[in-house]
């Protein structure tokens, strides 16, 4: 029998560690004397709060601003604030334990959607229930996923073009109506005269028309920019293969689908075939690759570093 390691003995004698408590206890303890937000008679009533969590406390892995909220309320709030434009797809052919970690990271970086490819049942252990706050879609194959994603992008482009058309028609109608009103005023059809000798109602009408046209023009510019982003959308696979591009020099498109494979085999041949680009994380040690879950986190954060604003 080996003698106890001296470091281990010293560690036991150190009195460490002391961990801080995460989350909040029951509402009555954390907010003594304050009305409960789930009480219909309370001026602080808020439908987003969960009665069970208020009773028992909230130790979930959520941001403090979501303490005591229902799962649905949190999900709706994330949607309302706007999720990021990247999506995550994970191949589930081997029931890899890393999938849960990838889903958790996708939640942390507020991915628009998570796609599980392959069997419907996946290893949720590492997700720590974060999938409840995500939009998760299932696909039987990579081919079906890619077709679905391209169709969604095409649909969004069509919707944006329709929006641009409506804005252009609105601007044209406002300008035409204003020009017609000015013509009438020039013929003496307007009434009220201001101190400057100009027609007051015509002046106000002109300002309103200019403002409305400017708003419509700005909307058209926003739509054009959005269409360019959608047209530049790409499917990006993460794997180390000949011809892959180092992530450190890769410019991630704002709208993209990130493909991740399983620990060991990596991505399937079909996934690599259908991807627009393949990127890899540069390795400087002796190993060929890092853990699949860690690699996915690095890739998602690379997108965040290039496109996302700093979190509040």
Spans of features found by a protein language model:
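Post-transcriptional modification and biogenesis factors for structured RNAs
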Residues: 1-312
């Amino acid at each position: 029998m080996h003698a106890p390691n001296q470091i281990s003995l010293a560690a036991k004698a150190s009195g460490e560690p002391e961990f801080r408590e995460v989350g909040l206890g029951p509402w009555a303890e954390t907010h003594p004397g304050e009305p409960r937000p789930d009480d219909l008679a309370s001026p602080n009533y808020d439908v987003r709060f969960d009665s069970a969590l208020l009773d028992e406390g909230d130790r979930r892995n959520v941001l403090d601003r979501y303490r005591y909220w229902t799962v649905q309320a949190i999900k709706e709030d994330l949607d309302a604030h706007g999720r990021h434009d990247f999506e995550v797809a994970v191949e589930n052919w081997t029931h890899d334990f890393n999938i849960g970690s990838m889903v958790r990271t996708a939640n942390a970086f507020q991915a628009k959607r998570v796609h599980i490819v392959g069997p419907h049942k996946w290893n949720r252990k590492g997700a720590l229930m974060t999938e409840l706050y995500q939009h998760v879609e299932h696909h039987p194959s990579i081919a079906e996923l890619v077709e679905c994603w391209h169709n969604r992008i095409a649909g969004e482009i069509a919707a944006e073009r329709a929006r641009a058309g409506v804005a252009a028609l609105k601007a044209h109608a406002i300008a035409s109506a204003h020009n017609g009103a000015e013509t009438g005023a020039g013929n003496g059809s307007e009434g009220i005269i201001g101190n400057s000798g100009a027609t007051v109602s015509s002046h106000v009408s002109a300002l309103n028309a200019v403002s409305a046209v400017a708003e419509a023009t700005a909307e058209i510019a926003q739509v054009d920019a959005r269409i360019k982003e959608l047209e530049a959308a790409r499917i990006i696979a993460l794997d180390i293969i000949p011809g892959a591009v180092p992530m450190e020099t890769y410019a991630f498109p704002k709208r993209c689908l990130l493909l991740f494979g399983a620990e060991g085999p990596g991505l399937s041949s079909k996934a690599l075939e259908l991807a627009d680009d393949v990127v890899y994380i540069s390795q400087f040690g002796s190993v060929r690759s890092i853990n699949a879950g860690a690699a996915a986190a690095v890739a998602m954060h690379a997108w965040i570093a290039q496109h996302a604003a700093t979190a509040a």
